[in-house]
Every structure is written in C-alpha cells, then in structure tokens.
Amino acid sequence: MLVVLAFATPMELFFSEVWLIYEYQRQLMPLYVPVGHWFLFDLGRRIAAKLPPGRKIASWIVLPFIPLTVLMAYSGVDTSGIFLLMIMFGFVRWGPAPMLYAVMGWLALGMELWGTWLGTWVWASNVPWTGLTAWNPPLLCGAFYALGDVLVNLSTEKIEDVQNR
C-alpha cells in the first residue's frame, strides 16, 4: 500500500496541479484520492489474478478500445486517445503484469466515468502542452493508471530483491 501511495500522491498532484489535465471540484485534491488509488489497484490485482494469464489474452481485453478510440480521434473529441492506446498496448506487451494493466483500463474508465458524473472532477477538453483533445474522461484514462501500476510493480520487485539478499 505504501508503494502505491508513494506514486499515486505525487502523480495526482502533477496531473491536477501542474499539467492541469483535470480539475477537482474545489480546486484541491481530496485526501481520499491517493487511498482510492490503492483500493482500485487492489481490486484490479484481485480481478487480474482470477483471469487466465498471458499477454495475448490481456491484449484481447484491451482490443475493444481500438474502434472507440479511432472513432473519437477521427471526430476530434479525444485525439489524445491514440497516444494513450499506444501506451496501454505498450504496457500490455512489455510490462511485468499485462493482465493487471488490461483490467485497470476498464476499471479506471468505470471509476472515472462515475467520478465525472458525480461532478467530483472534470477533465480538460484541450490537453495542456500538447494540442490534443480529451473526452471527459479520456476513453483510455486507464493508461495513466497503468503507468502508476508499472511503477508500483517495478518498485515492489526491487524492494523484494533487496529484502531477499
């Protein structure tokens, strides 16, 4: 949990306070957000453990994002989705836990849809510094979660290596 919090907190602050890709309802990150990332990560980890392992199966889970991403990019609603899709497939292809990243793509989208529907946060329609557009939330917001999960997995692996010496 501490490793998740160590990455989730600064990443949230960077994305919301520096990059400004989304904004919280009262302009400040609620204290429950980093812990919420741990709960979502743990749920994703548990679901991924119950699914058949393998990069090929994980790729199939992410596959439905392709037509939606292309449609949204073509219409101009979410041009950032093309890049996020490539990032997501990169994590599924080369990351240490491909099924986790595939599962997190869907869990993150569900959670982000719920949070935006509640009005807890809103994503910027124009992604700062990039010239890209984003849906509210971006269809592949799960790529940001997968980035955090990759960092957590690699860090945890290193910590365990050091402890086992």
Predicted regions and their residues:
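Aromatic-rich, lipid-facing transmembrane alpha helices and their immediate juxtamembrane interface loops
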Residues: 1-165
